[in-house]
Amino acid sequence: MMEVTAKLKGAPLSAQKGRLVADMIRNMNVSGALDVLKFTPKKGAKLMLKLLESAIANAENNNGADIDDLKVGMVCVDEATTLKRISPRAKGRANRICKRTCHITIKVSDEE
């Protein structure tokens, strides 16, 4: 059994929106997950596609794994730091804008 991990830290995406995409590819074959991510019109899908391709490349290069046997094991989307910005409003007031980020972890394994 071989398990390979790829991580993306501080992705400019809220964890809630990232989890919507993560739920679609969890426990899928790698080829099926790539197809799903390519045709999903979400920002998180684009980020996870690059991360999944990185995990596949890690498995191939470091462990000599066969792509056809690989399966997406764990997809974890956790909250990261929130960037706090200020938007000026009328009469000298200001509103806070929270730009949320997340950490995405994908584990790929050849386990059935």
From Swiss-Prot:
The record, for PROSITE patterns, names: RIBOSOMAL_L22
Q: Which UniProt keywords apply?
A: Ribonucleoprotein, Ribosomal protein, RNA-binding, rRNA-binding
Q: Which Pfam families match?
A: Ribosomal_L22 (PF00237)
Gene Ontology biological-process annotations? translation
Which segments cross the bilayer?
none
GO CC, any one term: cytosolic large ribosomal subunit
Quote the Gene3D superfamilies the UniProt record gives.
Ribosomal protein L22/L17
Q: Which domain of life is it from?
A: Bacteria
The Gene Ontology terms for molecular function here are:
rRNA binding; structural constituent of ribosome
Return the similarity comment. Belongs to the universal ribosomal protein uL22 family.
Q: How does it assemble?
A: Part of the 50S ribosomal subunit.
HAMAP family listed in its UniProt record: Ribosomal_uL22_B
Q: What does this protein do?
A: This protein binds specifically to 23S rRNA; its binding is stimulated by other ribosomal proteins, e.g. L4, L17, and L20. It is important during the early stages of 50S assembly. It makes multiple contacts with different domains of the 23S rRNA in the assembled 50S subunit and ribosome. The globular domain of the protein is located near the polypeptide exit tunnel on the outside of the subunit, while an extended beta-hairpin is found that lines the wall of the exit tunnel in the center of the 70S ribosome.
What is the name of the protein in this document? Answer: Large ribosomal subunit protein uL22
